[in-house]
Structures are given as structure tokens and as C-alpha cells.
Amino acid sequence: MKPACPDSECFSQNAGPNPRFQVRKKGYYYRRSDGQHVRRYQCTKCSRNFSSAALAPTYRQKKRHLNRWVLKHLCSGVSQRRTARLLGVNPKTVVRKFRFLADQARLKNLEYLKSIAPQSLTEVQWDDLETSEHTKCKPISVALAVDPYSRKVLGFRASRMPAKGTLSELSRRKYGPRKDERPKGWNQLLSELTPIVHPEAEWLTDQNPHYPQYLKRHFPRARHKTTPGGRGCIAGQGELRKKGHDPMFALNHTCAMLRADMNRLFRRTWCTTKTLEGLVQHLELYTWFRNQHLTPELEAGAG
């Protein structure tokens, strides 16, 4: 199918219901980056020449063939520097492609939420995963919502939080008071899920004392069930529980996979998150990769 003229000021945009009739084919050109022959077009109204590649998000990329490899490496526990070494490119190339892929993944994640039937989800699991930026004195909480049937990630929000326990005094002394942004993240996450979750859906969480008030604010008729947390089956990996039956297995298993497949979330690693924005971009990328490739193709909420 012929594309329409990309010029928004072209007269063909107002030439009836189908502006594609104002475009004609005009040969091909050879693209050296991936060895493809790309079709050229010409608009009969403004005489502008353009190609089918001009409408793609990878327009003018020189190494577009590396996009899928960067995606697979960064969602398989490989760091950005090691990805650059394995692919034989400059580390800055991997950083640029990481940011590009994260932007595309964010759009894909929004499309997935729109594809879910309105208020069709009757069960949701919700919990927080904790990590840090630069140092453990700067913790970050990632609120995560998962469909227990398909195990697809429905949404997340990463928020800064103050340090707890023995690190709290050291954190205040070195970096000053740290604002707790988790309430804002919880409100944003629940607000994002309002169109697709049934008002009387069953929400399963741990016994966090803060969850009920925020759940009541966005889903006043929802059924809220809690389950006590348990010890991790492996020291330092609290996501996988030691007890025999885990009611929140879908969410805990998702968190365990996040720690296994995202290098910056490893328990013992020097590839720590440097900025909150970088963590959010990586989570967007992995969420799309998981929902697309690592979870079964089931209808959301179908058990």
C-alpha cells in the first residue's frame, strides 16, 4: 500500500478521504546499513520525494540491524558495556540504542494496555521491589502490578524513598533528607490501571500497612486480600519464597526474573543504577520484552 505524503502542509492531506492516491512510485534506492532496497515515492501535489523508510522509527539509523541484538542482550542480564564489546561497537552506540528502544517499548506498553478490554481484569497482584541508585543509601521502590493468569506486567512506577534500618543515619549524614515519593507512584499506578481493572476486582498484596488507603481511594469496591511475607528460598533473594505454597507466586516470580534478567538489579553487582530515569527506561524495555516473548499468549484475566 502506498503511504501518504509525510508533509503535513501538503495539499494532498486535504485531497479527499484517501491521500494515498496523490502519491506515485519512483524507483528504489540501496540502503547500505542492512543491504535492503527501499521503495521511493513522489507526491504529485508538492513534488516531494520520500521513501517508505522515512515513516519508520528507525529512519536515518546507520546500524539498525543491531537493535534486536541490543534488546536481547539488555533483557538477558548483560550490561551495556559488555553488550558493546560483544557486538563490536562503541559503548555510546549501545546507550543511544538503549534509549531509542526504551522509547519504542514505552509506546508498545501503552498499546498493550489499550488492547485490554475495559474493566476485564478481575484479579491483580501488587507489590514493591526495592533497589537503589548509585548506593544503597539511596533506595528506590518499584511498584509492580501483574496479571496472575498471564503473568504479564500491567504497570510499574519507580519512586525514590528514604533509607531504612542501619543505613538511615548514614544516608541522612552523607546525602541529606530523602523525600518519600512512593505515595505518588502508587497513586499513578492505580490510576493507570483504573480503565482495565474491574471495580470489584480482587487485589492480592502483602501486609504493607500503606496499601489499603490507596487501594480504597481508586477502587473503593475492590476486594483486598493480604498474605504474609515469607523467607526467601535462597539467601538474599526474597522474591522466591521458601514456603510450599506462595499465593503471590506470579508477582514474586516476575520480580525474581527482573533481578535475573536486568543486570542493574542483580543482588551483587557493580552495574548499579546511576539515575532513576535509566532504571525507568530499562524497566520499560524489559516489560515489553517479557510481555511479548516470555509470557504465554493468553487473554488478560482468563484463567
Protein language model regions, located:
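Residue-level recognition of single "structural anchor" positions
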Residues: M1-G303
